[in-house]
């Protein structure tokens, strides 16, 4: 391959994808597939008695991300390289990631994920690109000879940012992009002078500052120190990445006014949006530009992807923390805000409500999404429904002011990892029927449609699914000690644990089914294996209690011989990309049951679809577009619509007690949270979950994610699934049609839309002579 690492000396437009997370997964197998060498390497190793899959298992999952945000970033990098575009991913080289999850006595316990303990072969340290990052101190203003004010940050602490490049190999095209993850080092390792004075903390202060910056992803921010560390992390990698980008630009170009022609900074969610003010700072203070010049450049270089509909997830910083840690950056944000508020008041006189909603600085907070929208030349949502809700609801005021900025880019996934690598049996079957072009053009799988009713193709598909279920069942036996039946329905929900994703509704339904079987042992019921996988944020009490509930329900049900194994419940510990590939391949039912209007897009739904699982979901996020692609007969939709949910929220007319008091099955299940059934008679263990469903909590309404409202519709949809699965031919037809209609959901399509509409990139010209 050519070690192009973003085209090396090529004077093409670069895209810097800034993200707090990159959930890459293991690199060896994926790189071999993209190099077209997997089969040859596998055969060569077998000749000397080695198993490539065993070798792959020795590689740790890089602990650089947690959930869908990070996995999307990884898919995008794969697609950028495969499509031949120059790109850097920009993030942090976390030493311990978020955490490694252990389940002890049913509870989640967080331990460090020491993925770097044995080194990592797929990274290259680049000390020649070292930059100073400053925190704290104060700003001194001086009048220069040119008569203009000059600003200098003094009395600060600083660290050095040093990048590690991880290669992102394009499929079959000799292009290698780079994931540039930043490590922090102290400017001074150890202060002997401070140590000799007995000030031992001061002696290692620089070292501690650097180490803390890159220890963990998303440190707990339930306290001031945690908030400070998160903000420092964000500024650290953003500042370093911009400094690197400008150095690279100036190596090839003389005029920084041309920066927008050659560089785009895509801000993945609100975490990197301090990039707006940092780019301004460098242009103003280090390059000597006027405000108008710097603003013109910045507002044509930065673009923002919004990933959430929920207002509480739009990042805000207390002004006092922001100002103390980033004094010069804060001054610039303050000036951006002052000018923007003037615009608002000029356009909407006597409308302070507009100012309240749209100002960057308001009520003691720095609103990072507002900063990104004001400065960004593009603001995109990640599914059509999500973007519509942003435009009509959450960001309506901004959309009215800047309609030209808003656009939709429905998320996608890379078929190379999640089919070619993750499910080789199915990948070979697809290739046998439609050729291998699907690997770089997923739309080609539409040709599978004609095989959906073919009995031979159906039987082949079902046998492949069975083999993948056997593989996962073996893993579950080895890691969980639970025997599961590969002939049962594998019903799967694997994703970040959050109340709006409604893992609680799923496990309540399992409890409901268990009650039904206990009361009616002879009832017609197709055996189910319910598989969960999720990490809860360390400080998220309700989410962690949900994990405990899932595990205690599993203990009760799995050890009850009276139900003859009709239900099994499994919680996959430390859910991560490498095991996710096996889970997607084995799933029959894909649970995508978020409260309508809350999930921006989702990408797990697409991975299941690509692997021939049938979706059980709400009309939320990308489920809506999946429904349109695959048709109503091949997906199980239930529950309230986004409009209905939003209407209830606006009118405050939903009372979960109305359902609780009028549905005895629901009442029984909810009461079991506090009657000791699943808690060894500890009636308080799940009281918090019980209260969240029925009693308003800390200013929040009861059952804010409408679990009880949707429960009966969910149970009915599950019942239909049980009946439908018994018709293996019909099930296989629907599963094959799901694969056939997954073409839209390739990240290749998504990235090409970003390129065409936002980034305007040119493809890398690769000279393959001698390769």
Language-model segment annotations:
Residues 242, 269-280, 293, 297-298, ...:
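Extended, hydrophobic alpha-helical segments in both membrane/secreted and soluble proteins
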Residues 302, 309, 466-580, 768-769:
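Long, K/E/R/D-enriched contiguous segments that form extended
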Residues 2-7, 12:
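Single conserved hydrophobic/aromatic residue that forms the stacking wall/gate
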Residues 123-268, 317, 321-382, 394-496, ...:
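Active-site cores of enzymes that catalyze phosphoryl transfer or operate on phosphate-rich substrates
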Residues 91-92, 99-104, 108-123, 290-335, ...:
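Catalytic or ion-translocation cores adjacent to nucleophile or general acid/base/metal-coordination motifs
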Residues 61, 84, 98, 239-319:
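An amphipathic, hydrophobic-aromatic interaction surface with interspersed Lys/Arg
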Residues 53-64, 217-232, 256-268, 276-285, ...:
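Glycine- and acidic
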Residues 397-447, 585-586, 593-735, 739-744, ...:
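Catalytic binding pocket for nucleotide-activated donors in carbohydrate/polymer assembly enzymes
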């Amino acid at each position: 391959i050519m070690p192009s690492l973003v085209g090396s000396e090529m004077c093409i437009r670069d895209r810097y994808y800034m993200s707090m997370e990159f959930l890459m997964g293991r690199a060896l197998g994926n790189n071999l597939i993209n190099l077209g060498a997997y089969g040859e390497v596998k055969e060569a190793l077998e000749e000397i008695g080695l198993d490539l899959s065993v070798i792959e298992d020795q590689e740790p999952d890089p602990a650089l991300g947690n959930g869908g945000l990070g996995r999307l970033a990884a898919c995008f990098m794969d697609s950028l390289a495969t499509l031949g575009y120059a790109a850097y991913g920009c993030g942090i080289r976390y030493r311990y990631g978020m955490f490694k999850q252990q389940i002890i006595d049913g509870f989640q316990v967080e331990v460090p994920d020491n993925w770097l303990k044995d080194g990592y072969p797929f990274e290259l340290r680049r000390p020649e690109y070292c930059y100073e990052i400053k925190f704290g101190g104060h700003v001194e203003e001086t009048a220069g000879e040119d008569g203009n004010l000059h600003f200098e940050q003094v009395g600060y602490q600083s660290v050095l940012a040093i990048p590690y490049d991880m290669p992102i190999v394009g499929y079959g095209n000799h292009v290698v992009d780079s994931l540039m993850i930043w490590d922090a080092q102290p400017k001074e390792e150890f202060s002997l002078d401070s140590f000799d004075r007995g000030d031992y903390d001061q002696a290692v202060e620089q070292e501690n500052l650097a180490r803390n910056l890159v220890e963990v992803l998303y440190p707990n921010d339930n306290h001031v120190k945690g908030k400070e560390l998160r903000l420092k992390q964000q500024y650290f990698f953003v500042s370093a990445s911009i400094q690197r980008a400008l150095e690279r630009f100036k190596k090839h170009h003389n005029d920084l006014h041309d920066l927008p022609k050659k560089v785009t900074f895509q801000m993945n969610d609100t975490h990197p949006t301090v990039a707006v003010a940092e780019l301004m700072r460098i242009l103003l203070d280090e390059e000597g530009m006027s405000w108008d010049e710097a603003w013109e450049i910045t507002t044509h270089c930065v673009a923002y992807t919004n990933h959430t509909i929920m207002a509480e997830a739009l990042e805000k910083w207390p002004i006092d923390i922001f100002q103390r840690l980033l004094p010069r950056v804060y001054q610039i944000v303050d000036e951006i805000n002052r000018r923007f508020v003037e615009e608002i008041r000029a356009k909407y006189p006597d409308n302070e409500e507009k100012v309240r909603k749209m100002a960057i600085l308001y009520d003691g907070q720095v609103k990072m999404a507002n900063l990104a929208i004001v400065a960004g030349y593009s603001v995109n949502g990640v599914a059509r429904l999500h973007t519509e809700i942003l435009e009509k609801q959450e960001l309506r005021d901004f959309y009215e002011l800047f309609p030209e900025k808003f656009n939709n880019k429905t998320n996608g996934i890379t078929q190379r990892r999640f089919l070619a690598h993750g499910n080789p049996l199915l990948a070979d079957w697809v290739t046998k029927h439609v050729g291998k072009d699907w690997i770089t053009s997923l739309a080609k799988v539409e040709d599978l449609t004609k095989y959906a009713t073919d009995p031979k193709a159906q039987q082949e598909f079902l046998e492949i699914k069975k083999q993948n279920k056997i593989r996962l069942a073996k893993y579950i036996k080895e890691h969980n000690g639970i025997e599961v039946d590969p002939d049962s329905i594998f019903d799967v929900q694997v994703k970040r644990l959050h109340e709006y994703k409604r893992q609680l509704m799923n496990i309540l339904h399992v409890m409901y089914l268990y009650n039904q079987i206990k009361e009616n042992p002879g009832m017609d019921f197709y055996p189910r294996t319910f598989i969960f996988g999720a990490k809860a944020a360390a400080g998220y009490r309700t989410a962690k209690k949900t994990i405990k509930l899932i595990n205690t329900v599993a203990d009760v049900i799995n050890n009850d011989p009276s139900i003859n194994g009709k239900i099994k419940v499994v919680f996959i510990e430390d859910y991560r990309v490498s095991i996710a590939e096996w889970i997607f391949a084995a799933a029959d039912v894909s649970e995508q049951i978020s409260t309508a209007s809350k999930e921006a897009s989702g990408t797990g739904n697409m991975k299941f679809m690509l692997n021939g699982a049938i979706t059980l979901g709400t009309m939320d996020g990308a489920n809506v577009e999946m429904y349109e692609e695959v048709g109503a007969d091949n997906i199980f939709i239930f529950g309230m619509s986004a409009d209905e949910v939003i209407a209830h929220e606006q009118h405050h007319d939903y009372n979960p007690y109305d359902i609780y008091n009028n549905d005895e099955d629901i009442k029984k299940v909810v009461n079991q949270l506090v009657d000791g059934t699943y808690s060894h008679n500890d009636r308080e263990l799940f009281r918090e979950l019980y209260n969240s469903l029925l009693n308003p909590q800390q200013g929040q309404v009861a059952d804010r994610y409408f679990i009880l409202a949707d429960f009966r519709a969910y149970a009915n949809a599950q019942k239909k699934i049980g009946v439908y699965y018994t018709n293996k031919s019909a099930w296989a037809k629907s599963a094959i049609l799901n694969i056939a209609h997954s073409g839209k959901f390739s990240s290749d399509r998504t990235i090409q839309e970003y390129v065409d509409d936002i980034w305007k990139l040119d493809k890398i010209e690769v000279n393959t002579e001698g390769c």
